[in-house]
Amino acid sequence: MSLKVVIPTPLRKFTSGAETVEVEASTVKEVLDNLDSRYPGFRASVCDESGSLRRFINIYLDGEDVRFLENLATPVADGAEIAIVPAISGG
């Protein structure tokens, strides 16, 4: 399935500044695997050593937080859009 991934500004250093990239995948995990194959080091920026999403990273599939779906096993449909959103804290 071909889908669009919206890359946040802090991670664009991996994509040579590209704001969006197209990937082929059937799950969110495959999206991250494919991004890491094309852009080495990408996965380590969004996942911890165990392969889980880092606490401060949110991934949305067509506006739905994948943590409330099937997490990284969430299936993706052709034409879907994934947005990777790093949390911002302040105080």
What are these regions (language model features)?
Residues 1-90:
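Ubiquitin-like/PB1-type beta-grasp interaction modules and other compact soluble beta-rich domains
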